[in-house]
Design a protein with these regions (language model features):
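Mid-to-C-terminal catalytic subdomains of enzymes
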Residues: 231-259
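Glycine-centered flexibility motif
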Residues: 2-3, 200, 217, 258
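N-terminal amphipathic/basic-hydrophobic helices that include classical n-h-c signal peptides
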Residues: 1-20
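ATP-dependent adenylation/nucleotidyltransferase module used to activate substrates
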Residues: 14, 19-239
Length: 259
């Protein structure tokens, strides 16, 4: 369990008219049948669209999750643009799949992958584990280091036991790759256009995303440093595949190759 939200978080949610979420409520949402999840996601999408007067976009990676999200959004609002960041690291099949879609804005990072790893270090395992390893190897806070090694009082937020040997790796490790190559291009696009993102991430993907989802009261994040909407944030991986099959939505062929 993630524990209760702080009093300040609850008060902030009340003041902005937002939803207050806890771990049990998230689990309840995650256990709903798909048809109800679709209805809730559609409502969150409408709320976001109306709040920003239609100045929105879908963050589109070509992966199955963002493919489902794009399909749901465009069933409601066909003219919403999709935005794809071409990092140069994508499978050729992903690039071909993205090109099949209309109204997609292509962005590029200002720094290539080689330069990123030279400057910041290698992304390993996952973004979350890379961040934890980075903070252990480079951080100055002993309190944070202890959490990353042993976990918080709920046992969360630590490097997995199987990856602790990487603490002594001879090469630098960092989570900065995603920030430089993916997040920065999106941030520039948002600043230039004023458009706010729908993002196809799910709380079930990592403990950090679960914490973010709960802390911010659900799908639509209005008070974070980067405002964003996670309309399928309470879905599970099985829901994605069920949606693709039920609605016969084409998805990238890399998934049929075992990736």
């Amino acid at each position: 369990m993630l524990g209760l939200l702080s009093t300040q978080s609850v008060n902030n949610a009340k003041q902005r008219g937002g939803r207050i979420m806890d771990a049990k409520q998230l689990k309840d949402l995650q256990s709903l049948p798909l048809k109800y999840k679709i209805m809730i996601s559609q409502e969150r999408i409408r709320e976001w669209y109306e709040h920003w007067d239609g100045q929105v976009y879908v963050s589109f990676s070509g992966g199955k999750d963002s493919t489902v999200l794009l399909h749901i959004v465009r069933e409601l609002y066909p003219d919403v643009p999709a935005v794809f960041v071409d990092t140069g690291l994508e499978y050729p099949e992903i690039r071909r799949f993205v090109k099949k879609h209309e109204n997609v804005v292509w962005l590029k990072p200002r720094m290539n992958f080689k330069r990123v790893i030279e400057k910041y270090g290698y992304p390993v395992i996952s973004k979350e584990q890379s961040q934890f390893l980075f903070e252990i190897k480079t951080g100055s806070s002993e309190k944070l280091r202890k959490i990353r090694l042993e976990g918080n009082k709920y046992g969360r937020g630590k490097v997995s036991e199987r990856w602790k040997y990487l603490i002594k790796s001879p090469f630098p490790i960092s989570h900065k790759c995603c920030e430089v190559m993916k997040k920065s291009p999106f941030a520039r696009y948002e600043k230039e256009t004023g458009n706010k993102p729908y993002i196809g991430v799910m709380a079930s993907e990592s403990s950090m995303r679960e914490i973010d989802y709960i802390k911010n009261g659900g799908c639509n994040f209005y008070e974070t440093s980067r405002v964003k909407s996670w309309p399928i944030g309470f879905w599970n991986d099985s829901d994605i595949w069920e949606y693709l099959n039920i609605f016969n939505v084409p998805y990238c062929s890399v998934y049929d190759m075992g990736y």
